[in-house]
Amino acid sequence: MLIVRLEYKTKLYSALNIANRIVYLVVVIPLLFIFKESHFEVLIVVMTFSLLVCMVAGIYAQSDIWKFRGKSDSANNLDMLPIFKYAMPYVISLGIATLFQAIDTIALNYYGSYSQVGVYSSAMTIIQVFTIVQTSFNLLWQPMSVEHYTNNPNDKTFYQKGNSIITVVMFFVGMTLILFKDIFVVLLGEEYRGAATILPFLIFNPIMYTISETTVSGLIFMKKSKMQIVIAVGACAVNIVGNSILVPLLGCEGAAISTGISYIVFFSLRTVFSNKYFYVDYKLGKFYILTLAVICYASYNTFFKFDIWSVLGYVICIVLMYIMYSKTIIWCFKYLLSIIKNKKQL
């Protein structure tokens, strides 16, 4: 799947993901009826099987790259030891990141109740609206940025433009979700009612992670994978301390606030360390001004019900974003209009 991403074969990537889900559903449903007392084992086996099918299909679709017979291209004969040394810190940081993402739920289990965990989980479900933007962007950005660095190592406008565009998109979606959070909750059903006050700070999770994908490029280009461990430990420590203090005081809202702040720290650490090895002027001053404004907006909507101030706060944040990112917003509008015009012509 990684090679598919590197080749920008988005249709093949989507087809493999869909095939993976279809195989999983087709196989798992009958097996669950047959082995009624072994549901966990069935799920593990079927998940492994569907991934193997996806892997085989991907290799077959790219048979020109995967050469198992005859002489292989000397350019593809890589020394695995440097690759292993580069990859190991990512494995460690992934383990720490898993703990980082679970701390809020663990804290709610320890300091709160199962009902609070349920409400918090429902809020996280609504946040999945970001998944479409986040996954689509992350799918293509890293291969594109690495390719651009390989071809034009001194051209940094590409990273600045990518950062500005995804900043505008993610903050716009996040602020809009905060404004209409009560409507989303009502539409989704009674079990989501308690999620309305938790949502505002949870938006910083996908916002900061996705934007940081554009600012962390320096660590990737310079192969400073060990710094990923430092970043993961720093963000995780902040989240542990934050949840330990705020969850006993505020419950679910405290967990959301702590998680949101820790993701801002996560973004900052990624950006600072990346700029240490490969400096890019991301105009962080205006970014943090916008972030502070959205923090204030999220705070109000966490502790107060929807009213005229919620709408006014949204308008202020949108105007502020337009003032600081006007060129990017205008470019985005022109780009969308060009897509619409091209579709009409077809």
Predicted regions located by residue number:
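Membrane-interface junctions at transmembrane-helix termini in multi-pass inner-membrane proteins
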Residues: M1-N17, I203-G234, S274-K276
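Hydrophobic alpha-helical transmembrane segments
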Residues: A15-W66, V233-V238, C252-F273, Y314-C317
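Interhelical loop/hinge segments that connect adjacent transmembrane helices in multipass membrane
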Residues: H39-V45, A57-Q101, M144-T157, F278-I289, ...
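Interfacial segments at transmembrane-helix termini and the short loops linking adjacent helices
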Residues: Y114, I178-I207
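Helix-loop junctions and terminal segments of transmembrane helices
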Residues: A123-N163, V216-F221
